[in-house]
Amino acid sequence: MESWLLRRGARVRCLHPPSWLPAWCFLCLLPVPQTLQLTGLVSLTHTSLPIMVSLANTDVFFSCRIEDFTRLQRDLPVKLFHTDIHGRRRWEKQINCQHRPGMENHTRDCMVKLSQANTSATGIYYFIVEGEETYQSDGVVILVRDTVYQPPAFKVQEALMLGFTSLMSVLGVLGTALLLWKKKQISVLGKHTAKTCSGLKSTVGTTKPPAESVYTSLQRRETEVYACMKEETGSPVFSQSPATKEKLNRFEDDNEFNLVYENL
C-alpha cells in the first residue's frame, strides 16, 4: 500500500511539477531568444540639443552616441548626411568616432563640427550606421541666421493710428479756438447793438422835423413833442429833467413866433 502511494505520488509529481520548475525552465530558455534578438542591434542617441540656432560664420557642434549590443569587436562605419529645408539631401560624408574606455558594449561618441557655417547649412542632420542593417538616428535641426535679431519694422497700422490720433488732436484744438472766438464775437456784437440803440434814442428829441408849411407844423408840433418826450423817458412831462423843460419852452416860443407871423 505504501509503495502504491509512493508510486502515485511520483506520478502526481511528474504530472504536476512543483511551482519552481516552470520558472527554472523559463530562465533556462530566456537567453536563447534574447541572444537572437540582440544580434546586429545598434542604438543611436543624440547627446546634443534637437534644435540649434546659430549665427553665420560661427562654428556649430553637435554629437551622438552609438551603442553596439552585439559584443563583437567591430567598428561600424558612421556617416552624416544633410537635408535642406525642402527635404532634399545635400551631401553625405563619413565621420570618425571615439571609443569609450572600459565599456563592454563598445559605446562610441561621435562629435561633428560645422566650421564657419552659413545660411546654406540650415537644415536637418542625420547619423547613419551601416552594418548588417542600416540604422538612422533622429534628425538634428540647425538654423543658421545671417543677421542678428532686428525689431519689427514700423507697421502701417501703427502709422495710421498715429496719424488719426494727431488729426483728432488738431481738430479738437481748432474747434475749441473757434468756439472761444465765436463767443467773443457774440459778446462784442451785443455791446455794439446796445450802444447803437441808446444813441438812436438820445437823438430822437434833438432831430428837427422836415420843412413843412406853417399850418401843418402848428397842428403836429405839440403831438410830436409830447410823443418824443414820452418815448424817451416813459414818464409824465412834469417829471422831466431841466434840459427837457428847456426844450419844451423853446418849442412854445417858436409856436408864438409863428402865430405872430401869421397874423402879420
Curated annotation (Swiss-Prot):
It is found in: Cell membrane. InterPro entries: NFAM1. GO terms for biological process: B cell differentiation; B cell receptor signaling pathway; calcineurin-NFAT signaling cascade; intracellular signal transduction; positive regulation of B cell receptor signaling pathway; positive regulation of cytokine production; regulation of B cell differentiation; signal transduction. GO terms for cellular component: cell surface; membrane; membrane raft; plasma membrane. The chain crosses the membrane at residues 160-180. It is a single-pass type I membrane protein. Glycans are attached at N105, N118. Keywords: Cell membrane, Disulfide bond, Glycoprotein, Immunoglobulin domain, Membrane, Phosphoprotein, Signal, Transmembrane, Transmembrane helix. Residues 1-37 form the signal peptide. The keyword Transmembrane helix applies. The keyword Transcription regulation does not apply. The ITAM domain displays no close similarity to any existing ITAMs, except for four conserved positions. The phosphorylated ITAM domain binds ZAP70 and SYK. No direct interaction with the B-cell antigen receptor (BCR). Interacts with SYK; probably involved in BCR signaling. Interacts with ZAP70. This is NFAT activation molecule 1.
